């Protein structure tokens, strides 16, 4: 009976050690996060006019399908867009100032809406026989790092279709 009790006590001590070590590490991570957040809230507004804004090449889209998707696409294309995927709000505040966070988030949301809407619009273009216009838009989206499986699949199907025709 004594060896089992000794093993159990040693197990509890080791477990307690690892739990405390994990708590200390977690507390350190939290303290670093809140310190970074505190610093980011003190950053003044910086110029964002020179950022790499995404501009959809509307002049290369000659088609007028007169659909609600197309109307939404063209309305969205007029709005400023930035691909800020993977950048935290804290990092945005540190880099561009707290006052710019709301507008940068809006520009990022415009880009996210563009990525979500593009596959539907490209599908409508393909169905209307405008495969080259659809391909150009899909390639443009890939070029601005629009990470979407739907875009990739549509572009792949267009590539497969064109290679099978040749």
Tell me what each language-model feature is.
Residues 93-97, 159-166:
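Alpha-helical linker/edge segments of TPR/alpha-solenoid repeat scaffolds
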Residues 141-142:
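Alpha-helical solenoid scaffolds that mediate protein-protein interactions
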Residues 124-125, 158-159:
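Residue at a conserved register position within TPR or TPR-like alpha-solenoid repeats
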Residues 2-113:
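N-terminal alpha-helical interaction modules that lie
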Residues 117-118, 152:
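TPR repeat positional signature
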